Amino acid sequence: MEKPSAQVADNSKIINQLREAGINPTQQRIEIAQILLAQPQHMSAEQVLSQVNREQPLVSKATVYNTLGLFASKGLLREVIVDPSKIFYDSNTSPHQHFYNVDTGLLKDIDSTTVQIQHLPSLPEGTMADGVDIIIRLRNRQ
């Protein structure tokens, strides 16, 4: 079991991280941040909702979705859209790519040093590249 003093230190760190991002640290936002920002991981909104309400359901589905969107817009999380109906929230916001196993639903980071993009196509006039997302979709061998 985690010591109370360690929990207070973690809360202070999370609160400071939220404030530095310009986010008001409400209790629900702190709880969601503790789940997602504790370690590099990928979670869906449903997984976050389940985890945050594991002991006592206090956070609504709308609050989770709104908070995840806010965290992503402020750069605390990265949205990884593996298909139109499946979005993961990635606590690793540095540039990197992913493997997505369609059969298992597992999303895994790819070491960015192993992927090289040598040439991008010409961009439409008046635009600039904002990023390149690569998701390699996998299936298990039958």
What name fits each language-model region?
Residues 10-22:
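Short, Lys/Arg-enriched N-terminal segment that forms or immediately precedes the first helix
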Residues 23, 37-40, 54-55:
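Short helix-capping/hinge SLiMs at alpha-helix to coil transitions
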